[in-house]
Amino acid sequence: MPTAMFTADELAVIRRAYAHQVAATAATTNPRIEAAFATVPREKFLGAPPWQIANLGGGYRPLTSSDLVLAYQDVLFALQSEKGVNNGSPSLHARLLAELDIQIGDRITHIGAGTGYYSAILSELVGASGHVYAVEMDPDLAAHAQTALADRANVSVINADGSQWPQQEMDAIYVNFAVARPAEPWIERLRPGGRLVLPLGVPRLDRPPKGGRHASHGAALRIERGESGFAARWIGAAYFVCANGGLSIDDNEIEALTAAFRRGGIEFVKSLLWKTEPRIGRCWYIGDQWALCYDDV
């Protein structure tokens, strides 16, 4: 178990300082996001010490102390170091969560929930009248999330392939692994006005001896369903561990998406076409029944 060198009151101050730094790094002025990061106890979602944090050059190193105050850093903590799965950068997630424009009462599906830390942040943001569906394919991570989120009545943990969820209309969908294409439910089960944030990414060709297969090219995108189609916008660079299950891709998709990233121009994308014939020459990337294009919806 983590140890505590600080009193509960002191730890509350440390959490507030951590949340303030996270929000500032993310360049978000949304006070609800900062409050959520100040409220949720991150240590509940990191597993038992000794914790490991990511090195800048790759791999992980163990922390020499098990003091829970060390959880309140803007660093990556390993969840499954052999697979390259980590707790994520708080400031990156704060930035992406700000793009979701979450409202009290929203129904949100969190795809790739891991041990549930960002599901708990979402739980704070939607409030008691909203609901978070935390979907995680790995049974060990899902079991940890189930335990860590048990005190949150507005969260349901689902051990399933995220490519099959949600199974009903959602106000927002938040994806936490790199994909080369959106899963059908992520597009078709967004309600009008619904928002999707996902990391588009191409798997690295080489897989490190320790750690999972991360994206070699990556970009976070915001998709919003309007009356006449799907608006799309580039948020920024984002490199996540790549999808397994129903969203694994073949060599042809890897080659085509890699070529698009190398050409550049994703920052000019304005729309996502879904099961619609794209205009040749007006798209950054054309996939199977979907495309990212330069024209407004």
Each model region followed by its residue ranges:
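Conserved nucleotide-cofactor-binding alpha/beta core module
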Residues: 88-217, 224-226
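Short, intrinsically disordered/low-complexity patches at protein termini
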Residues: 58-59, 132-134, 255-258
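Short, charged low-complexity linear motifs
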Residues: 58, 171-173, 270-272
